[in-house]
C-alpha cells in the first residue's frame, strides 16, 4: 500500500463515527473517468519537462479542473502523474505539504480558513492576499480564476415558499433543528452547524452524505430527507431542479474562487500553463464544463481536451 493510499484511508476513517447516507450511484458524473496515473490524456503527449503529480478532491468538478491543469502542463512538455478523487483537505493537504502532490485546484476561502481559522478577509482579493502568508513553507498559490464554486445553504423552492426563506437566517422560521445534507467534514467547517448557530441563530442537524454535493445530496434534498443541502454553486443541478440558494448577508461562507495550490517543483513554465487555464475559467465556463459531466456523463479527460482546444490552449 502506497503512503498516499495509507494516508487517504486514515483521513477518511476520521469521519467514520458519523452516520452516513451514501452509496454507489450510477449517476456519479465522473466514476473512473480519469486517465490512469502516469498516463497522458487522449490527444496529449508528455515529455521533457520533468514529472509533476496533479491531484484532485473527491468531487467531479474539481477533477475536471485538475484535468485542465494536467493537460495544459503536458502541453508545456511535462510528464504528469494523476492522483484524482483523493478526498477532502484533511487528506490531501498533508500530501501537498509532503510534496507527494505538486498541483491541486483549490477554493480560496475554504483553503484560507483551513490554515487560518481566525482569518478576517471577506472579499476575493483579500482572501487571495491572506493566503500568501497563511500557507506553510513549500506551498504557494497561483493566480485565482474568476470562476468560483462555493458551498451553499440550498433549499427546494417549495420549502422556501412555505417558510418565506430568502437568506440563511430565515431558516429560523422553519422547525428546528433543520436537517442539512453535506459531507461529514461539514460538521467542523467554519460555515457548518456552529457557524450557522453563531451567525444566524439556526440549529442544524447534519445528515452526512459523502458525495461532495453530488447526486445523492441533491436527491436527499429533493425527496425531503433533508430540508437544506450544501450544494456547490457551479452545479447545474441547482438550476435544473429549481433549487434556491439562500443569501448569506453576514458572509458566513467566504468567496471560493478556483485557485491552484502548488509545490516548489512547479516552475515558471508549468505555472504559466496553469495560469493560462485560470485566465479563461469564468463562472459560466465552469458551469458549462460541469454540465457536460452531469448531463452527458462525459469523461473529465474528454471535457478538458475539448475545452482547451476551444480556448486556444491546446
Describe the residue ranges of each PLM region.
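Short, well-ordered beta-strand elements
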Residues: 48-61, 80-83, 176-181
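A bilobed periplasmic-binding-protein/Venus flytrap-type ligand-binding module shared by bacterial periplasmic
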Residues: 151-161, 256-269
Amino acid at each position: 500500500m502506497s503512503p498516499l493510499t495509507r494516508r487517504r484511508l486514515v483521513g477518511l476513517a476520521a469521519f467514520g463515527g458519523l452516520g452516513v447516507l451514501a452509496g454507489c450511484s450510477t449517476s456519479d458524473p465522473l466514476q473512473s473517468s480519469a486517465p490512469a496515473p502516469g498516463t497522458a490524456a487522449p490527444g496529449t503527449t508528455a515529455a521533457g519537462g520533468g514529472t509533476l503529480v496533479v491531484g484532485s478532491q473527491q468531487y467531479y468538478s474539481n477533477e475536471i479542473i485538475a484535468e485542465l491543469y494536467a493537460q495544459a502542463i503536458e502541453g508545456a512538455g511535462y510528464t504528469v502523474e494523476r492522483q484524482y478523487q483523493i478526498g477532502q483537505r484533511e487528506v490531501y493537504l498533508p500530501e501537498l505539504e509532503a510534496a507527494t502532490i505538486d498541483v491541486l485546484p483549490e477554493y480560496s476561502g475554504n483553503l484560507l480558513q483551513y490554515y487560518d481559522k481566525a482569518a478576517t478577509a471577506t472579499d476575493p482579493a483579500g482572501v487571495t492576499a491572506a493566503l500568501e502568508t497563511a500557507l506553510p513553507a513549500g506551498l504557494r498559490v497561483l493566480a485565482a480564476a474568476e470562476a468560483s464554486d462555493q458551498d451553499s445553504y440550498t433549499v427546494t423552492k417549495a420549502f422556501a415558499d412555505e417558510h418565506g426563506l430568502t437568506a440563511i437566517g430565515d431558516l429560523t422560521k422553519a422547525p428546528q433543528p433543520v436537517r442539512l445534507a453535506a459531507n461529514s467534514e461539514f460538521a467542523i467547517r467554519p460555515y457548518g452547524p456552529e457557524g450557522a448557530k453563531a451567525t444566524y441563530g439556526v440549529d442544524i442537524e447534519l445528515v452526512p452524505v459523502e458525495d461532495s454535493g453530488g447526486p445523492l445530496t441533491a436527491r436527499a434534498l429533493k425527496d425531503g430527507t433533508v430540508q437544506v443541502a450544501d450544494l456547490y454553486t457551479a452545479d447545474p443541478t441547482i438550476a435544473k431542479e429549481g433549487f434556491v440558494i439562500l443569501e448569506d448577508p453576514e458572509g458566513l461562507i467566504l468567496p471560493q474562487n478556483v485557485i491552484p495550490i502548488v509545490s516548489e517543483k512547479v516552475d515558471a513554465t508549468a505555472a504559466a500553463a496553469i495560469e493560462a487555464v485560470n485566465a479563461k475559467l469564468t463562472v459560466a465556463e465552469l458551469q458549462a464544463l460541469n454540465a457536460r459531466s452531469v448531463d452527458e456523463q462525459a469523461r473529465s479527460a474528454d471535457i478538458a481536451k475539448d475545452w482547451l482546444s476551444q480556448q486556444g490552449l491546446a
